[in-house]
Amino acid sequence: IGLTAEEIDKYINQIAFSGANDFLEKYKDDANAIIGHFGLGFYSAFMVAKKVEIITKSHQEGAQAVKWTCDGSPEFTIENVEKESRGSDIILYIDDDCKEFLEETRISSLLTKYCRFLPIPIAFGKKKEWKDGKQVETNEDNVINETYPLWTRKPVELKDEDYKKFYRELYPMADEPLFWIHLNVDYPFNLTGILYFPKVKSNIELQKNKIQLYCNQVYVTDSVEGIVPDFLTLLHGVIDSPDIPLNVSRSYLQSDSNVKKISTYISKKVSDRLQAIFKNDRKEFEEKWDDLKIFINYGML
């Protein structure tokens, strides 16, 4: 929707005005409030850019377009410019030692890792199609993310093939999963996700760190020790929760009340699923026992 000069001054310059120390002092008692703070993420652009420009025009009627320029120092300039349409263009002038971030494959891999399931569409270039034996760009935006991923949907809306397809998208080289558990709870904590029981290979270590942690569909990490019980870190899948503290040590994480509840909840859901298969489909349970026993034995230890 674009910004006015006053909004640029308020939202983009506020950290520069107050200084990093003042900013951190303001949020020292609520560190989680820093995450997602408007303007803070924007300033990380200077980690790779020697200069950043914002050319923006507000949606407000009669608004004047402006250009904000800064080289990463406390100094910046704001000037009036011409811009036909509303919205904002952010232009990064990449440092010489960060030119790798101009490579299409590098950008694509980073977007796929961190923005794959963002709730707003992210376009990277244009879609390509084959024409006369070669790939050519079309006029259609190449949207790289899925804004409504499987774990945000209700289980009643999904079929087995939907879960298997999602698993193949996450782990293209993996065998078909044994079964899965769809997590969806909003009280006393918020947690959604899908956990898959994989076919266990001979080297168990290679199977760890396959659970991806998200916060409101933003990728955080694939190291979930302390959140998921140790014996279940062999599982694959996705968990998404805004109630997991993201800026704390593992020891603090393990003492957090919400994390304890989430860990207990996941253990119970896995236990309930195994028990249901054992009671309702003993043949399937026995057929999959060689793959399942590692989880059960590890859990007993």
Where are each of the predicted segments found?
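GHKL (Bergerat-fold) ATPase N-terminal catalytic module, capturing the glycine-rich phosphate-binding loop
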Residues: 1-96, 100-101, 109, 116, ...
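GHKL/Bergerat-fold ATPase module in large chromosome/replication-associated machines
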Residues: 34, 52-75, 95-98, 105-301
